């Protein structure tokens, strides 16, 4: 592997600009070689002056890079030493409190943890939190050690290449005189901190069991994503292949059934609505797998952003596997419905069995089938539903945003419950989902729960914004963002009034609803592009209409995403126009089935650029890991700390004007330190790669 590729694969993305600019040095050397005057047509003195002038410029650039690296390394080392001292103090306090509690326990009857006071519970909990805190700190030390090794190797490689191209030894001399005596290379305190951390965790937190301690401190491999196990790859191919084949079969079988029942007033929409939500979930999981793959390839650290455990999180292949497996079950269930007369399973039992399995798969308490990931999702869903009572983090409002694009899933779930409760004829031995057209209770707004369900995702985000305003006391962006979600309430209210009224007043509600939709679409579109994606930056330079720094390689991706977002944000105009002009429910039903998958696709595109913007904010603050204390802070201190961390320009523009755009909350009272590290943290031996080709 060439060192350029090796460096690109092993750097910490949030510190990218602080590494040696190896590729720029290579271009500088090759450009000088190509532009050098030929000794055959130019006198020797001119050639010597050319090379002398170039070398002066080259070594000046090397000095600037070396100064940058020394400064950054010194800052991070000082930060690591402060954190280590803080963790030592917190560990000592927790151990003292635990010993005091143990002595006091000897004077009274033994009590279970359920009978302990809140203060005593915190003491027991702090030991667990400290284990996670030291694991997080250890990962940050490994990051810094890799930074040290990669930069030294980069200088050695580029100076060696310099000497080879120009047939001199001045590069090696400069390395000995400057690089090998540079503080970032000669300072061995980082190695000492790593050793002391391992010893402290072994003796104080793991009872002297070094193997257990090192297992806790284990770091995932650095660099490109590791290949998935062979069996996982096999299952992905199997499930996805079977899913594609079964999907084609479902389409053909569905068309045949429609032809058979054509003209007999059979209503197939209950069946479509019941299975539509399941398809949207499968589509969402599959596209999320593509998101994950794209983030890894582009160096967007989604593991840090979502505060996942870098030692154990789902890769794109795992998401493809889950989506493919659930997709196969979805297709089998539909085929069982379509050919119910040939099976022993009543037709109405198939959807119940399918979604019952989906639900059991999610809440399965056994530690199998991605238990930790499922538990993380359930905990996140709970935090979304109870948003006003918790501090809101990125993962919380990201999931709530996904629910806004999956609102049809919630509405179809409500429809299914209503249909099975009020419309399905359970007295029929075979059940019935292909129903004759007639009065429908569940799909009309006369059943008022639908309007409430449609407002729920927007309500979750609305109260999250209010909670963030309460925590930060910043009207912008939180109250302005809450106003964006409040427009959804007006859209739903007037849509319900439009559908439940007749006569002239019906059109009054229609016009008000259209006005509300236009406001909502413009509001959300501008927020997507400017706030969530960070585009239309005045300092974009050559990245016209974008931002100063972009992660994805082609500008066309951004322009296509802007056009796509504009089109799909206003896609509601098509079904509304056709419904008003033709007043044909079948047209509304067809478009109501086509547009939700497109909205899921829009959210898939949105995810790429939303996390890119968050990643660049982390880069601006060189925030590769979170500096989180185990000791609880009061509300004022925590808010002040968040405001310091939330400065969008970060360390790059410390002396410039502060620009508060967005709040990124993090809980210091119950730290999840091991889940906040980078996926690319590891201690590696920098191999002697050769790219002299």
Curated annotation (Swiss-Prot):
Swiss-Prot/TrEMBL keywords: Cell membrane, Membrane, Transmembrane, Transmembrane helix
GO biological process terms, semicolon-separated: cellular response to phosphate starvation; intracellular phosphate ion homeostasis; macrophage differentiation; microglia differentiation; phosphate ion transmembrane transport; phosphate ion transport; skeletal system development
Record-level Gene Ontology MF annotations: efflux transmembrane transporter activity; inositol hexakisphosphate binding; phosphate transmembrane transporter activity
Residues passing through the membrane, by range: 236-256, 268-288, 319-339, 343-363, 406-426, 478-498, 507-527, 561-581
InterPro entries recorded: EXS_C, SPX_dom
Subcellular location: Cell membrane
Region Important for inositol polyphosphate binding: start-end pairs: 157-164
Coiled-coil regions listed in the entry: none
Domain SPX: start-end pairs: 1-176
Membrane topology: Multi-pass membrane protein
Superkingdom assignment: Eukaryota
Sequence segments annotated as region (Disordered): 674-693
Cytoplasmic side: 1-235, 289-318, 364-405, 499-506, 582-693
Similarity remark: Belongs to the SYG1 (TC 2.A.94) family.
Entries under PANTHER family matching the protein: XENOTROPIC AND POLYTROPIC RETROVIRUS RECEPTOR 1 HOMOLOG, XENOTROPIC AND POLYTROPIC RETROVIRUS RECEPTOR 1-RELATED
The protein, known as: Xenotropic and polytropic retrovirus receptor 1 homolog
Organism of origin: Danio rerio
Gene that produces this protein: xpr1
């Amino acid at each position: 592997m060439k060192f350029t590729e090796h460096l690109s694969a092993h750097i910490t993305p949030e510190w990218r600009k602080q590494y040696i600019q190896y590729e720029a040095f290579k271009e500088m050397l090759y450009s000088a070689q190509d532009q050098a005057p030929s000794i055959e047509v130019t006198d020797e003195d001119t050639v010597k002056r050319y090379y002398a002038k170039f070398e002066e410029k080259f070594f000046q650039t090397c000095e600037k890079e070396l100064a940058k690296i020394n400064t950054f390394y010194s800052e991070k080392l000082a930060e690591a030493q402060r954190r280590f001292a803080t963790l030592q103090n917190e560990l000592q306090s927790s151990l003292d409190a635990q010993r005091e509690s143990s002595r006091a326990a000897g004077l009274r009857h033994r009590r279970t943890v359920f009978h302990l006071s809140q203060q005593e519970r915190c003491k027991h909990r702090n030991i667990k939190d400290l284990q996670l805190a030291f694991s997080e700190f250890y990962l940050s030390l490994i990051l810094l050690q890799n930074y040290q090794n990669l930069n030294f190797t980069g200088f050695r490689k580029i100076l060696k290449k310099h000497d080879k191209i120009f047939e001199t030894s001045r590069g090696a001399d400069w390395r000995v005189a400057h690089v090998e005596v540079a503080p970032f290379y000669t300072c061995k305190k980082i190695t000492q901190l790593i050793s002391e951390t391992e010893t402290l965790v072994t003796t104080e937190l793991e009872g002297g069991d070094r193997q257990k301690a090192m297992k806790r401190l284990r770091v995932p491999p650095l660099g490109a994503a590791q290949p998935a196990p062979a069996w996982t790859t096999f299952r992905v191919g199997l499930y996805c292949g079977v899913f594609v084949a079964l999907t084609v079969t479902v389409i053909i079988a569905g068309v045949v059934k429609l032809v058979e029942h054509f003209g007999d007033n059979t209503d197939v929409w209950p069946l479509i609505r019941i299975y539509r939500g399941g398809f949207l979930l499968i589509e969402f999981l599959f596209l999320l797998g593509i998101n994950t793959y794209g983030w890894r390839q582009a160096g967007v650290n989604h593991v840090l952003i979502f505060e996942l455990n870098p030692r154990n999180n789902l890769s794109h292949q795992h998401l493809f596997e889950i989506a493919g497996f659930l997709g196969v079950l979805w297709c089998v269930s539909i085929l069982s419905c379509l050919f119910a007369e040939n099976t022993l399973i009543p037709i109405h039992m198939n959807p119940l069995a399918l979604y019952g399995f989906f639900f059991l798969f999610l809440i399965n308490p056994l530690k199998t089938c991605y238990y930790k990931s499922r538990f993380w999702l359930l905990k996140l869903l709970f935090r979304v539903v109870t948003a006003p009572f918790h501090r809101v983090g990125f993962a919380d409002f990201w999931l709530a945003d996904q629910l806004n694009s999956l609102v049809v899933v919630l509405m179809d779930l409500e429809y299914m419950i209503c249909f099975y409760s009020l419309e399905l004829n359970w007295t029929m031995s075979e059940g019935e989902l292909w129903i004759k057209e007639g009065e429908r209770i569940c799909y009309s707004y006369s059943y008022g729960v639908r309007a409430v369900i449609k407002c729920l995702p927007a309500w979750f985000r609305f109260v999250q914004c209010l909670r963030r305003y309460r925590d930060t006391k910043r009207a912008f962006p939180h109250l302005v963002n809450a106003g964006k979600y409040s427009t959804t309430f007006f859209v739903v209210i007037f849509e319900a009034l439009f559908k439940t009224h007749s006569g002239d007043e019906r059109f009054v509600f229609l016009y008000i609803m259209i006005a509300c939709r236009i406001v909502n679409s413009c509001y959300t579109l501008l927020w997507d592009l400017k706030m969530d994606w960070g585009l239309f930056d005045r300092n974009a330079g050559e990245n016209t209409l974008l931002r100063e720094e972009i992660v994805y390689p082609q500008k066309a991706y951004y322009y296509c995403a802007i056009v796509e977002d504009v089109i799909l944000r206003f896609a509601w105009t098509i079904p509304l126009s056709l419904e008003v002009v033709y007043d044909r429910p079948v047209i509304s039903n067809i478009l109501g089935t086509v547009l939700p998958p497109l909205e899921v696709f829009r959210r898939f595109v949105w995810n790429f650029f939303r996390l890119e913007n968050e990643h660049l904010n982390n880069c601006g603050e060189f925030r590769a890991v979170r500096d989180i204390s185990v000791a609880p802070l009061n509300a004022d201190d925590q808010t002040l700390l968040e405001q310091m961390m939330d400065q969008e320009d970060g360390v790059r523009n410390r002396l410039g004007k502060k620009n508060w755009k967005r709040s990124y909350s993090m809980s210091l009272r119950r730290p999840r330190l091991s889940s906040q590290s980078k996926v690319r943290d590891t201690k590696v031996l920098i191999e002697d790669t050769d790219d002299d080709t």
